[in-house]
């Protein structure tokens, strides 16, 4: 594949780069990895049953490595457009610090390592879901959907929604309605989150030909879709309470967070088309990250509280 270099310092295939450990760590997309690790850990905590702490740690490390591997493969394939977009031009490959072939090998080795170790140490169901997640993100989303359809992140968002299901499967060796709800919370959250970003990064996406919804369908359609997905996310966020694997108290917290999420999305909907500052979109993007962390934190706190009460007979 062709890699564009804005700095004239492209590291060519076949040549050893002078990459640092920090460059390879950046290749793993640590910010994305942190969200993956957090939601996978939530799946471990929320699942009924017990997993040995050592196996739990191994599971989380394998999921983190698998997420990092898919990030490396994504950066390898997207290096040509990363070089053009302002927010990605300084990534290791387009900046010439890591050769594309090194990034590809790094991602493939980590992918295989994470899946095999998770299967051998924990169970093969969780390893299979992890393998499918890596494939879905690196191949289905990155190589196919991202550059071919404005629904790229709607379908591709499934890759980011699997971690809590993997964590759940590590404990139970099963996929259940409860773990599917955890999947759906992230799956439905993804469009509003990324389309908010796409609104204030429209020019970048247009420059590289990635058909994000605002560029293809326009701002107004995108804003309608953001509100719709925010509502769906808020509704799905309270389902754990209705399905009985979270308390009424959690439901109130989730409802409040969902109401704020919807409010922020409506602020984006009311934003005039062509607004250059895009402040409501930036606020929604920031709050959406907080929302996801807050919902899964509330679920874990609720679960730990119920375990405490069941073991002690009450708070006092």
UniProtKB/Swiss-Prot annotation:
- Principal localization reads membrane
| Bilayer disposition of the protein | Multi-pass membrane protein
| Catalytic activity reported | heme b + (2E,6E)-farnesyl diphosphate + H2O = Fe(II)-heme o + diphosphate
The record's Gene Ontology biological-process terms are: heme O biosynthetic process
Keyword tRNA processing listed? The answer is no
Report the CDD domains cross-referenced here.
PT_UbiA_Cox10
Q: Which residues cross the membrane?
A: 32-52, 53-73, 93-113, 116-136, 152-172, 180-200, 221-241, 252-271, 289-309
Q: What class of enzyme is it?
A: transferase
Keyword annotations from UniProtKB, A to Z? Cell inner membrane, Cell membrane, Heme biosynthesis, Membrane, Transferase, Transmembrane, Transmembrane helix
Protein task: Converts heme B (protoheme IX) to heme O by substitution of the vinyl group on carbon 2 of heme B porphyrin ring with a hydroxyethyl farnesyl side group.
Miscellaneous comment text of the record? Carbon 2 of the heme B porphyrin ring is defined according to the Fischer nomenclature.
Designated name of the protein: Protoheme IX farnesyltransferase
Q: Gene encoding it?
A: ctaB
């Amino acid at each position: 594949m062709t890699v564009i270099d804005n700095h004239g310092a492209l590291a060519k295939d076949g040549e050893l780069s002078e990459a640092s450990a920090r460059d390879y760590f950046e290749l793993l997309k640590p910010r994305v990895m942190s969200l993956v690790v957090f939601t996978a850990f939530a799946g471990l905590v929320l699942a009924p049953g017990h997993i040995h702490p050592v196996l739990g740690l191994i599971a989380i490390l394998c999921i983190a490595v698998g997420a990092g591997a898919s990030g490396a493969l994504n950066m390898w394939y997207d290096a040509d457009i990363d070089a053009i977009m302002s927010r990605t031009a300084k990534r290791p490959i387009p900046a010439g610090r890591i050769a594309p072939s090194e990034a590809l090998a790094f991602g493939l080795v980590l992918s295989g390592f994470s899946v095999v170790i998770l299967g051998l140490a924990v169970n093969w169901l969780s390893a299979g879901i992890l393998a499918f997640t890596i494939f879905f993100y690196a191949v289905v989303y990155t190589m196919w959907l991202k550059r071919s359809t404005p629904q790229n992140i709607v379908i591709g968002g499934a890759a980011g929604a699997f971690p809590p299901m993997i964590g759940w499967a590590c404990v139970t060796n099963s996929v259940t309605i409860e773990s599917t709800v955890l999947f759906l919370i992230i799956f439905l959250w993804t469009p509003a989150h990324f389309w908010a970003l796409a609104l204030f990064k429209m020019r970048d996406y247009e420059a590289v030909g990635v058909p994000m919804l605002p560029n293809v369908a326009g701002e107004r359609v995108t804003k309608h879709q953001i509100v719709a997905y925010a509502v769906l996310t808020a509704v799905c966020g309270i389902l754990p309470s209705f399905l009985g694997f979270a308390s009424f108290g959690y439901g109130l917290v989730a409802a409040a967070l969902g109401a704020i999420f919807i409010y922020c999305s409506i602020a984006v909907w009311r934003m005039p088309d062509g607004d250059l500052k895009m402040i409501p979109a930036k606020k929604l993007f920031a709050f959406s990250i907080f929302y996801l962390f807050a919902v899964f934190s509330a679920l874990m706190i609720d679960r730990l509280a119920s375990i405490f009460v069941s073991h002690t007979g009450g708070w006092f």
